[in-house]
Amino acid sequence: MGNEGKEDTLPSKFGRYTLVEKLATGGMAEVFKAKILSAHGFEKQLVIKRILPHLAADRNFVSMFIDEAKLTAQLIHPKIVQVTDFGEVAGQYFIALEYVEGFDALALLRTSAQRQVRIPLPITIFVMMEVLDALDYAHNAIDGGGKT
């Protein structure tokens, strides 16, 4: 298997993707900036969300992850990243997502708190309105079977 998916040796191959940088690790999954290379020099950046290894054997969790991939793939909205692929590599399930360049909101909040500087209210309101627009869409989305 080589260095298949080992984050301590980035960049590393993960199936047809190359994991370039670890972006985050949560309680259930880890997220990587990645790229896919194809014919004639085609290259695309994306994000790989991969189940943590210790959860990969939990059938209930894997089932929830699969449901997440299926549901999220149905959400087509300009403020929601698109699912581009779903699969399994060497027993590790993953979701491939559109990569969106931007700033780290958590880092902004932490820096603001450390410096005791408030984020200007118009910026806060704008960000919240954008998030609420996406949440409203996701909450009211209807699947192919007519269910919300």
Go through each PLM region and give its residues.
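Conserved ATP-binding/catalytic core of the eukaryotic-like protein kinase fold
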Residues: 1-148
